[in-house]
Amino acid sequence: MSELRLMAVHAHPDDESSKGAATLARYADEGHRVLVVTLTGGERGEILNPAMDLPDVHGRIAEIRRDEMTKAAEILGVEHTWLGFVDSGLPKGDLPPPLPDDCFARVPLEVSTEALVRVVREFRPHVMTTYDENGGYPHPDHIRCHQVSVAAYEAAGDFCRFPDAGEPWTVSKLYYVHGFLRERMQMLQDEFARHGQRGPFEQWLAYWDPDHDFLTSRVTTRVECSKYFSQRDDALRAHATQIDPNAEFFAAPLAWQERLWPTEEFELARSRIPARPPETELFAGIEP
């Protein structure tokens, strides 16, 4: 099999396991090289698993999250690298406080773009994935991740940009991952009802107007990867500080998910080769 290379760019450790993880596991299993690039260490992330909300964990959160990322990458079968920036945290309140001076979201765009361009030129991916302009949700690091990823995609092949950052490499395609679609959540919620159970997604669905499911309309590419859903879930559980094993994410049985929604969804944002959506592969149209 000819080797193709996929780079998934994420803001924090755990994002790679909740957004497109089964697709990464599938391509790695098929013999392609898959690299996850994590832009920050997640140092300012909250502890979302009550069992991990302990003084010792708080005191070692950066170290623990690095270990969690190592485990998740091993489970998915992917390569991994850190870009080395510091988590910005998620400001809260009607008048949220300013972001910390040392955080990723405040690093000049040229600086963070050059750092990612170095990785792109070294790994030489055919395809990159990242978040859309809204970051998937409005965390400052997710929005910055989008900006940096798009900038690196555009700059990596330009020999005039960042001439000291390695030999230029042109990435063929850039995708946005769309992991949380209302249609999917509604389908699983309805399946709970058919089994006489109260589904866990009622409150989430209440916030979304079913007549304005704009993310679904942006999807161009659906990758069949149901065989790897269990790996996806195991990788997410490896991020024990960030996910409660009893959380809604794991509520729907895998058998339901595999039958009702066996794909992960992406939006082809930029392409330097002819593209004919709808697609079923991120590497569609690419020859190594």
UniProtKB/Swiss-Prot annotation:
Family named by the database record: Belongs to the MshB deacetylase family. Mca subfamily.
GO terms for cellular component: cytosol; plasma membrane
The EC number(s) this enzyme carries: 3.5.1.115
Keywords of this entry: Hydrolase, Metal-binding, Zinc
Protein name, as recorded: Mycothiol S-conjugate amidase
Activity regulation note: Partially inhibited by MSH when MSmB is used as substrate. Competitively inhibited by the GlcNAc-cyclohexyl derivative 5-(4-chlorophenyl)-N-((2R,3R,4R,5S,6R)-2-(cyclohexylthio)-tetrahydro-4,5-dihydroxy-6-(hydroxymethyl)-2H-pyran-3-yl)furan-2-carboxamide, which also inhibits MshB.
Reaction catalyzed: mycothiol S-conjugate + H2O = an N-acetyl-L-cysteine-S-conjugate + 1D-myo-inositol 2-amino-2-deoxy-alpha-D-glucopyranoside
Necessary cofactors: Zn(2+)
